[in-house]
Structures are given as C-alpha cells and as structure tokens.
Amino acid sequence: MQVSLNPEWLARNNDEHKIRRNDHRSPFQRDRARILHSAAFRRLQAKTQVHGTSLNDFHRTRLTHSLEAAQIGTGIVAQIKLKQPEFRELLPSDSLIDSLCLAHDIGHPPYGHGGEIALNYMMRDHGGFEGNAQTFRIVTSLEPYTEHHGMNLSRRTLLGLLKYPALLSATRAAIPPPAVAHQRQLKAKDWSPAKGIYDCDLASLDWVLEPLCESDRELLGQMRAEPSSPKEHRKTRFKSLDCSIMELADDIAYGVHDLEDAIVLGMVTRAQWQEAAAAQLAECGDPWFEEHIAELSEMLFSGKHYVCKDAIGGIVNALLTSISVKPVEAPFHNELLAFNAYIEPHMGNALEVLKHFVSQYVIQIPQVQRFEYKGQQLIMDLFEALSADPERLLPQATGEKWRKAQEQDEGMRVICDYIAAMTDAYAQRLHQQLFSAQSHY
C-alpha cells in the first residue's frame, strides 16, 4: 500500500528554532523526549492507578501504567508490521506510539475518578472537566516548554491524543443533573463527565485538524446513535489509526496488569476469578483461552510471583497478537482516519471480561471507593477555598494567570488547571494546611 502523508502532519503550531547541535532526531523522537522530561509526566509517579492499594509498594501508579501501555503499544505495532507489511509505511513509528501511550494519562487529576468527578462538578458552569480534555490542554498550552503552545508537539502526535475529537459542548448531556445542596451529597454517577475537548481549546483543535478536507473533519466529529435520554452524554464515533492503537494498549494494560496487582495484593480470590472471569473466558469463543484457561487460572493463583507473571505475559501476548489493521466503516479520505486497529471479536470479548472483572472486584469495591470519595471531597474543598479568594490563596505565578484569565471570565479554568496538576500527596498536604488545626507549615 503506497502512502504519501501530508508533511503538515509533522508540523508544530509554533515554528520553533531551537539551538540544537547536530540534532538528527525525527519529530516524534523529539515529541517523546518532551513528554518524558515534562513535569506533567513526572507527576504521574505520585498519582495512584488504583486507590486503596498503596499499603504495599508493589502497586502500580499512573506512571508505571503509562510505561506498560507504551511497551504494549510498540508491541502491537511490531506484530502488525509482521502480519500486515502493506501497512508498514502508514503505521506509527515506535517513538510516536511511545509518545501517545506515555502522554495519554497526564491530564488525570489527583484521586483518579473521584478527583475527576469533583472537578467536573465544580466546573459545571465553566466548561466542565475531563481527563482526556485536560491531557490535550496540557500538551497544547499548559506545559511550560513554550510560552503559548505547551509542549508544541507534532500535529500527528496531537491527532493521536484525540480520543474524543469533539467539543464538550457537543457531547455533554442536554439536561444536566441539578446541583446538590451540599457537596457531601454529590453522587459520582450523576457527574461522570462527557468526553471531548474543552470549548476554550477550540483554536488548538482546529489547528490539529487543519490538513483534513471538510468532509473528513465533519465525519470525524460525528456522534454515535443519539442517547436514549437527554440526561445522557453523547459519544464520538471515530479516531485516528494511531489513537486506536494507543487505546487498545491502554485497555490491555488496564485489564491485565491491574488484574496482576489485584491478585498479588490479595484483593481478589480464586473463587471470585473462577466465577466472574474464568468461566466466561472459557466460553468467549477464542480457542486459545478455551484451551489454556484452566492452566492460566492455576498459574495466576499459584502464590509464586514468577509463575503469575508468566501467565500475565501469556494473556498480554494473546491479546496483542490478535490485533490487526482494517478499514473504518466510513468514507474517510485521509489514510490516518480511513484505517483503525481492531482486536478480533472473540479476543475483544475476552478483554471486556478482564476489564469488567477488574472494575467489579477492584475499582468498585468499598475499600477503593472510600478512597475515591475522600479524594472527591478533598478536591471540592480545595476548589471552594481557592475560588472564594484566589488572590489571597493561589501561588504567585498562578495568581498572575488567574488575573489575566479573569479578563475573559476564564479564572475558574486556571484554578481547575492548578488543582488538576496536583499529585495525591500535594493535594492532601494543601488541604491540611487550609483546613487542619494540627497542620504545621
């Protein structure tokens, strides 16, 4: 397959002239370096992947999850190149897929989903909050690599980070839930955010999509079927090839590696696994799982780390090698949109079983949900205090940004950006400084 991609996909919003002696790196190698060396990426080491597991230092953080997703992402690309060499020129380089997987979580706030719910509620009248939208905002404007364009990444890299290529105003439910009388009464399920890009970042989104023809742009922003209720959010249908690979890598890292955490930390039992996962995997329709599930179950719960790790590696490999590139069922003209990576249906069923098991027996258990609830309350307390008297309580540099943003009535977004960037520990420390009588500065 002959591919001639528009050189505009290598462009940067700010045509920078860096002083770099003998720099022979590709644009995507430079992108990877910028992400890896960013403060936003470093902070992921102090944002826990699954809350309530941190009594043991074995647990994964957002940073280790991102590293694992990157390793899986490059593995997906390598095996597609072997299996479908005709797509070799179209597929992302290792540096590009690495960049996407390393950056995909940097917009996540402290305290995971609890923090996301809290910020979305507090920003309900100011454009909302969502982790993927925040990731896009960090790389395009907030991270101080350039004055106005964030990390100033290549256009194709930014396209690959657009999991939901539409504005939040287009995806948000037509009828929002009513505000609560007191934040302690806030139900998480009512304030789960819509997925998309902040309306205030429209200029950055427009720049990324500039090389696309009008029909491709229109199609890319298309929604899935209308929701059954005006209280439900709408969802976008399409994403780029690079993004589809990153998303599969993320799903596999979540479904399989978080399962490993849960087993080693004793959060799930053999009986729970047998009933809620092994039985379904044996019937998922894939011959590999049907043949090996009994042996895999033995290995996972053997009590020996190296045996469990071997089983985890086998599952990752089985999922990874069942992914291939196929045409998207839509008339896109641009090759980056006309093809996506898909997992074989039976293996897709198996991945859904694993993700559901992790959600049901790890994420949704009271031990984890109490941590998320606590974080949710803590973040809302911080937002309430900082927004009540920002000139008094914000750090000097953030206060300056707030004053400038207030001229366009965007001050709340600056406060939101400040809190979203915090690590779990920093948010907790600031909360103690503001609200605890025992706090010592």
UniProtKB/Swiss-Prot annotation:
Single GO biological process annotation from the record: dGTP catabolic process
UniProt-recorded Gene Ontology molecular function terms: dGTPase activity
Coiled coil: none
Keywords: Hydrolase
SMART domains listed in its UniProt record: HDc (SM00471)
Pfam families: HD_assoc (PF13286)
Disulfide bonding pattern of the chain: none
Domain HD: 62-255
Family under the similarity heading: Belongs to the dGTPase family. Type 2 subfamily.
Full protein name: Deoxyguanosinetriphosphate triphosphohydrolase-like protein
Organism listed in the record: Vibrio cholerae serotype O1 (strain ATCC 39541 / Classical Ogawa 395 / O395)
Lineage: Bacteria, Pseudomonadati, Pseudomonadota, Gammaproteobacteria, Vibrionales
Encoding gene per record: dgt
